[in-house]
Amino acid sequence: SIPPACDKYSRLPGCPRDYSPVCGTDGKTYPNECVLCLSNSEENKNVQIYKSGMC
């Protein structure tokens, strides 16, 4: 698994709307890396990227 590059999104007010799905180590498909980072910070989790694309 690959840790998401959350640092590059930390200054943004929200996530970009581009659809570039990643599969998290929790088995969920996220629309993009930023959404995974946002979910991690909101829910105090440490989900990583299992693979690019849908799960």
UniProtKB/Swiss-Prot annotation:
Molecular function per GO: serine-type endopeptidase inhibitor activity
Protein name, UniProt field: Trypsin inhibitor ClTI-1
User: What broad class describes the main subcellular location of this protein?
Assistant: secreted
Q: List the disulfide bonds.
A: C6-C37, C15-C34, C23-C55
According to the entry, every stretch annotated as the Kazal-like domain falls at: 1-55
Per UniProt, which keywords does this protein have?
A: Disulfide bond, Protease inhibitor, Secreted, Serine protease inhibitor
* Source taxon at top rank: Eukaryota
What residues correspond to the site Reactive bond? R17, D18
- Pfam families per UniProt: Kazal_1
Q: Where in the cell is it found?
A: Secreted
Q: Which SUPFAM superfamilies match?
A: Kazal-type serine protease inhibitors
User: Mind naming one GO cellular-component term on file for this protein?
Assistant: extracellular space
Q: What does this protein do?
A: Inhibits trypsin and plasmin.
Matching SMART domains: KAZAL
Q: Which InterPro entries match?
A: Kazal_dom, Kazal_dom_sf, Prot_inh_Kazal-m
